[in-house]
Design a protein with these regions (language model features):
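Short C-terminal tail/terminal secondary-structure segment
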Residues: 90, 95, 145, 226, ...
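Substrate-binding pocket helix/loop in short-chain dehydrogenase/reductase
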Residues: 94-98, 102-107, 206
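Active-site helix of classical SDR
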Residues: 121, 156, 164
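Short, small/polar-rich loop/turn modules that mediate ligand/substrate recognition or access, typified
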Residues: 172-176, 235-237
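Residue(s) in the substrate-gating loop at a strand-loop-helix junction
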Residues: 140
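Alpha-helical segment proximal to the catalytic Tyr-Lys
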Residues: 126, 168-173
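C-terminal substrate-recognition "lid" of short-chain dehydrogenase/reductases
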Residues: 127, 214-242, 247
């Protein structure tokens, strides 16, 4: 047990934003729990790149797994300074096709995207309070504008935004809680969801909608998460859009 080293838990850390955030924290001296659900090999690769890190399997929809993930951090480092709730899931169903999305789909998406962050925060709360720790929830602009991969996903991220505000209010002053809201983020998750053939076309469509004319990388989202953890001591209860201006949109060509 090395209580002098700060420690962080990143859920859903085998790929994408979670992996990039794990690496970001490791380069700043954090010990990192790299949580994964299915991608053991990918998580092990991320943990190896992070140095003082461990990969821990767990489904955040299961409370016992959440408590085991928090326990792994305490066993290794004796403290939890930061929790990044990045694990997420969806059903890629066009919003025009209501009949394809059913109650079990909503239940699974909400179990991971809303109940998971709540259970992880609850499991880590006492340790976070001891060190004036930080929670960052990885939400989505979908939760504000009602777009995205499905009704279930957008609704779950809207709920996560509200959960962020509730936790920030009630865990203060010891713990800060914020959320980052990405838009389209390059990487495997969306590529697998929309299919290889459609990926570049969909990416271009989202870039055209964005005020900055581009989409984001996992590393750029990780930079924002890292700032909320290490560089924003008076920021709490905030929903930070990290979306290249997708939610803002672009003016009509005649207005530019």
């Amino acid at each position: 047990m090395a209580r002098e080293r700060k420690a962080a838990i990143v859920t859903g850390a085998a790929t994408g934003i979670g992996a990039a955030t794990s690496r970001w924290l490791a380069t700043r001296g954090y010990g990192v729990v790299v949580n994964y659900h299915r991608s053991a090999e990918a998580a092990a690769t991320v943990a190896a790149a992070c140095g003082d890190a461990i990969s821990v399997r767990g489904d955040v929809a299961r409370d016992e797994d959440c408590r085991a993930i928090a326990g792994a951090a305490l066993d290794r480092w004796g403290r939890i300074d930061a929790l990044v709730n990045c694990a997420g899931t969806t059903q890629f169903v066009p919003m025009s096709e209501l009949e394809r999305l059913n109650a079990p789909d909503f239940e699974r998406v909400f179990a991971v995207n809303v109940i998971g962050p709540y259970q992880m925060t609850r499991a880590a709360a006492a340790a976070l309070k001891e060190v004036l720790g930080v929670v960052v929830n990885v939400s989505s602009v979908s939760g504000l504008v009602g777009s995205g991969s499905s009704y279930a996903y957008a609704a779950s991220k809207g709920a996560l935004n509200t959960l962020t505000l509730s936790l920030a209010r009630n865990l203060a002053p010891e713990v800060r809680v914020n959320a980052v809201l990405p838009g389209f983020v390059e990487g495997r998750w969306i590529r697998e969801g929309v299919g290889e053939a459609a990926y570049e076309r969909v990416k271009e469509q989202w870039a055209e909608r964005a005020a900055l004319g581009r989409v984001c990388t996992p590393e750029e989202v990780a930079d924002a998460i890292g700032w909320l953890i290490t560089g924003a001591p008076v920021v709490t209860g905030q929903l930070i859009m990290v979306d290249a201006g997708i939610a803002l949109g672009r003016p009509p060509a005649v207005a530019r």
